[in-house]
């Protein structure tokens, strides 16, 4: 029972099941690498081509910092920008690592960070036989592993968040492209620094513009996060569900942590089982008649799936194999006891009531109040958690999985 809960998740549950995780100010380092292609297309798995520039933004310093290889430079520092130029890549990377050690960021962010920047800088440092442990907080060697759809990266003591990955998770509709240029134009109405030829040619012929290009990418990454509040959103999920940052992209892990904390000191939950994937019939969709119609109405049921689960007291522990007196009977196929309130019903009701309280408070204080944005983030997070509970009920790897519940819904 609960034998599969890893140490970190167990500690989060034990220490914070009945209290909030503090909303700390996260020190974020947004960064972007520029890599030379004169020697060929860079191999991410080996880091075989030199890094020629690193632009970053520190959220505490509120400043853009550039580390680059340059023989001569005429760019001067300002209040919002600092430039550091070096003769060799080793010297540049050494100073960047020292900057990371000195500023000690909680989080690295980038656009396509998992797919390029994070694995590349880790592997480039290894290629050069430099001390990659200086990227971490605890003198541990960073890890990067090739997966089917990218890389799994870990820098110990620091969170890695890929803005492209966050954006894909948050965007309600699929985009034509998820490139930084397309998303920036779509969300901000502005895009990357334009240039002709190759980036290596720009580096050689117009170094100032090359640096502007590198900085501009980081500016767009910062602006996207400021507008869409992506880090705030996923941090809100993390704190509410009491899970790790790397878990927030998987609804099953988020809800698992949420339910473990909710049941702490009340119930001991079963360990996860390796169930075979099963299919079940979903909702019946009626095909509309063809043609053009007047007076068309559109109905939306508020929190339909969570409401169904609460109305019929659905959960792993209330599902009956055989009917009992007074039980809930669905199509003479699925039976749920009414002798006790289900875990999922109680949890859903608490989330819905708490969300309603947030929305009432928002109306009372108005958008000009400093508390408004925090409440708005809170109520959206609770909405997502409610919908995610339904989503994981039919997932075979869920701790409280039972296909009959998914079918009954």
Language-model features: where?
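Extended, Lys/Arg-enriched charged tracts that mediate electrostatic binding to polyanionic substrates
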Residues: 4-12, 20-39, 130-132, 137-147, ...
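Conserved RNase H-like, two-metal-ion catalytic cores of nucleic-acid enzymes
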Residues: 9, 15-107
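Conserved catalytic core of nucleic-acid polymerases
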Residues: 1, 5, 301-304, 314-315, ...
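Conserved DEDDh/DEDDy metal-dependent 3′-5′ exonuclease domain
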Residues: 73-174
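Short active-site loop/helix that positions an aromatic residue
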Residues: 117-126, 302-316
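Acidic, Mg2+-coordinating catalytic module of metal-dependent nucleases/exonucleases
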Residues: 102-117, 158, 163-251
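Common nucleic-acid-contacting/processivity interface regions adjacent to the catalytic cores
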Residues: 200-312, 371-409
């Amino acid at each position: 029972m609960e034998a599969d809960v890893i140490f970190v998740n167990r500690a989060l549950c034990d220490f914070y099941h009945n209290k909030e995780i503090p909303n700390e100010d996260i020190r974020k380092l947004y960064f972007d690498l520029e890599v030379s292609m004169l020697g060929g297309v860079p191999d991410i798995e080996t880091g075989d081509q030199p890094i020629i520039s690193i632009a970053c933004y520190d959220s505490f310093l509120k400043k853009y910092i550039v580390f680059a290889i340059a023989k001569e430079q005429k760019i001067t520092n300002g209040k919002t920008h600092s430039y550091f130029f070096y003769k060799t890549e080793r010297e540049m990377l050494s100073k960047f690592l020292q900057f990371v050690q000195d500023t000690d960021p909680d989080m690295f962010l980038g656009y396509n960070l998992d797919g390029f920047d994070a694995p590349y800088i880790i592997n480039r440092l290894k290629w050069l036989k430099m001390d990659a442990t200086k990227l971490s907080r605890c003198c541990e060697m960073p890890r990067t592993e090739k997966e089917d759809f990218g890389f799994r990266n870990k820098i110990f003591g620091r969170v890695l968040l890929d803005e492209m990955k966050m954006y894909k998770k948050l965007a309600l509709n699929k985009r034509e492209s998820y490139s930084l240029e397309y998303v920036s134009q779509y969300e901000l109405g502005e895009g990357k620094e334009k240039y002709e030829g190759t980036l290596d040619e720009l580096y050689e012929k117009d170094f100032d513009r090359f640096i502007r290009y590198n900085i501009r990418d980081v500016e767009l990454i910062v602006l996207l996060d400021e507008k869409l509040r992506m880090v705030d959103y996923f941090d809100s999920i993390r704190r509410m569900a009491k899970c790790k940052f790397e878990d927030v992209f998987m609804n099953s892990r988020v809800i698992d942590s949420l339910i473990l904390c909710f049941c702490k000191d009340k119930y001991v939950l079963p360990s996860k089982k390796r169930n075979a994937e099963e299919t079940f019939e979903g909702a019946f969709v009626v095909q509309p008649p063809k043609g053009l119609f007047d007076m068309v109405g559109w109905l939306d049921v508020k929190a339909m799936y969570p409401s169904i689960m609460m109305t019929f007291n659905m959960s792993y522990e209330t599902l009956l194999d055989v009917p009992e007196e007074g039980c809930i009977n669905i199509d003479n196929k699925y039976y749920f006891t009414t002798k006790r309130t289900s875990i999922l019903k109680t949890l859903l009701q608490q989330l819905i009531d708490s969300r309603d309280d947030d929305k009432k408070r928002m109306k009372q204080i108005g958008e000009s109040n400093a508390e408004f944005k925090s409440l708005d983030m809170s109520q959206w997070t609770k909405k997502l958690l409610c919908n995610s509970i339904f989503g994981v009920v039919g997932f075979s790897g869920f701790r409280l999985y039972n296909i009959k519940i998914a079918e009954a819904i």
